[in-house]
A protein has these predicted regions:
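Acidic-and-aromatic substrate-binding clefts and catalytic sites of carbohydrate-active enzymes
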Residues: 14, 40-47, 71-73, 230-235, ...
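Radical SAM enzyme core and accessory elements
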Residues: 1-9, 28-29, 33, 45-62, ...
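Flexible glycine/acidic-rich beta-alpha junction loops that bind and position SAM and/or redox cofactors
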Residues: 98-103, 184, 234-235, 290-295, ...
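Short, electropositive alpha-helical surface patch
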Residues: 238-245, 334-354
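Structural recognition of alpha->loop->beta junctions
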Residues: 102-121, 271-279, 343-363
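Radical SAM [4Fe-4S] cluster-binding motif and immediate context
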Residues: 15, 153-319, 329
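A structural motif corresponding to the C-terminal end of an alpha-helix
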Residues: 30-32, 217-218, 247, 275, ...
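Acidic, low-complexity intrinsically disordered segments
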Residues: 1-212, 217-219, 480
Length: 484
């Protein structure tokens, strides 16, 4: 049986990055022996070398690095060169949703996007002289744009079966994927799979097997969901809630939700609660009616506000609830006054129980090698945006600079990028005292022996990594992994 190692590379401890485990699961189903190594960014170089020495054998064909949005730390860079020096016959593969923004002559192949189909094609290529399509825009890197050339969507089997050698502990939160793609097409979104028409969600039996297996092996009951919009389909929610009803343990899940759908479809609240979805991340974006309508979120703002308060009260009466709200400053027709009015409402109404509101300045990528451009990116002039005459002081602070090749330094008739960034920074300073633990970080506190009710009351910066509990877990994991 052919063998490979896949390292999970990201900077968030103690999250187990889903990508490497998903690729490993898919390869195992195709006859491979794959071992995943988590938290690789936090291993020392010598620990990584010793581990590899203990695992390499004559059937080892490649070593992969699954990188969270291009994360490529120094220890991994040095490790890749060491691998190429000591094991030149073994291929090195980089996988991520973003193109590499670094140079590394030791990497043989790069996959960008959802890569289940691409990795099978690639393995056949370098082992059996098969055919492969590389991205011809790159002369010095062999890159496969998986979403275009070997699309792994739609896909109705998205489960991951973990192995005992993954050394998962019962307090951990794993990531689960129900469906791939979003049925909506918000004008600011550059996610590559938008406007999905049909239900391609994973089968109920697949979901049941996945969560039962994780519980039976490790005692895990808590999950982050990878779906772009968890509540986009009523029948899908009911399907999984019916499975949850049959389990002899209670699930807890956190994920991305559309608040307007929740408000309009109260009949989804019960199945969501039965499924254990009490952590909600809402992309509200704006409380300006004209702005919301222009980007695909046209529900009346007053109805949204009233609905949010009702949602919080209903879910929190059953289990400790966390509702995170994201707002985007600078969308079409948003004025400084309407923006500040919306923030004022959040400050007054959405900080109880530590509910957190995150604000972001609008990013308008003009070019990107690794993602689709949004409607706003493709139509920014028609939407009233212009290039700033005076270069912005804040362009470097906008997060997509890590992923986009060029961002628009924008202004319109209402504000500019610099004002938007400064406004968001000011808002953060004002509400950070009241910020609770984000929906994506409840798992960080699993070793603290806190009830969800107690955790709901904690502030965002409570016992953050690095801390003794997680450091002990990391070293425990590394020691056991090397000794296996």
């Amino acid at each position: 049986m052919d063998h490979a190692l896949i390292f999970g590379v990201h900077d968030m401890m103690p999250h187990r990055f889903l990508g490497p485990h998903r690729i490993a699961h898919y390869l195992r189903n195709n006859g491979w022996d794959i071992e995943v190594v988590d938290f690789a960014s936090f291993w020392t170089l010598e620990q990584l070398k010793n581990f590899i020495k203990s695992r390499i054998h004559k059937k080892t064909k490649f070593i992969g690095f699954g990188c969270w949005f291009g994360n490529w730390p120094e220890n991994i860079d040095m490790l890749s060169h060491w691998i190429k020096d000591y094991y030149p016959e073994i291929k090195i593969i980089y996988g991520s949703h973003t193109y590499p923004k670094f140079n590394n002559e030791s990497i043989d192949y790069y996959t960008v996007g959802y890569a289940e189909k691409a990795i099978i094609q690639l393995a056949n290529y370098f082992q059996n002289n098969g055919t492969i399509k590389f991205d011809t825009r790159w002369e010095n890197k062999k890159i496969i744009l998986a979403n275009d050339t070997y699309p792994a969507f739609p896909m109705n089997e998205l489960g991951v079966i973990y192995e005992h050698r993954d050394l998962i502990e019962p307090w951990e939160w794993l990531t689960i994927e129900f469906t791939r793609g979003c049925k909506f097409s918000c004008k600011f979104c550059n996610y590559p799979i938008l406007g999905v028409k049909d239900d391609h969600s994973t089968a109920a039996s697949d979901f049941e097997y996945t969560v039962r297996d994780a519980y039976d092996k490790f005692g895990v009951t808590n999950y982050y969901t990878a779906d772009e919009t968890l509540n986009q389909d009523k029948s899908m929610i009911e399907k999984y809630a019916n499975v949850a009803d049959t389990l002899n343990f209670k699930l807890r899940m956190h994920g991305f939700m559309r608040a307007d759908l929740l408000i309009a479809n109260k009949d989804t609240w019960d199945p969501l609660s039965r499924l254990g979805v009490f952590g909600h991340m809402y992309g509200i974006e704006t409380f300006n009616k004209k702005t919301g309508s222009s980007v695909g979120k046209g529900m009346d703002p007053l109805k949204v506000k009233e609905g949010l308060l009702e949602i919080r009260e209903w879910f929190d009466a059953i289990e400790p609830y966390r509702g995170n709200i994201n707002m985007v400053c600078g969308l079409p027709f948003e004025t400084k006054e309407t923006w500040e009015s919306g923030i004022e409402w959040l400050m007054k109404n959405w900080t109880s129980k530590g509910d957190i509101s995150a604000t972001y300045a609008l990013e308008i990528p003009l070019s990107s090698m690794d993602s689709k451009l949004s409607f706003i990116s493709n139509n920014w002039k028609a939407l009233g945006y212009r290039r700033r005459k005076t270069p912005s002081e804040s362009l470097h602070a906008v997060s997509s600079l890590k992923y986009a090749d060029e961002l628009l330094d924008w202004e319109n008739d209402y504000m500019d990028l610099d004002w938007a960034v400064k406004s968001c920074n000011t808002i953060y300073k004002q509400y950070k005292v009241d910020m609770g633990v984000s929906v994506w970080h409840w798992g960080d506190h699993g070793l603290m022996n806190l009830s969800f009710k107690d955790l709901q009351k904690k502030q965002k910066h409570y016992n953050q990594w690095p801390n003794k509990e997680l450091e002990d877990f990391l070293q425990r994991y590394i020691k056991k992994k090397i000794e296996l």
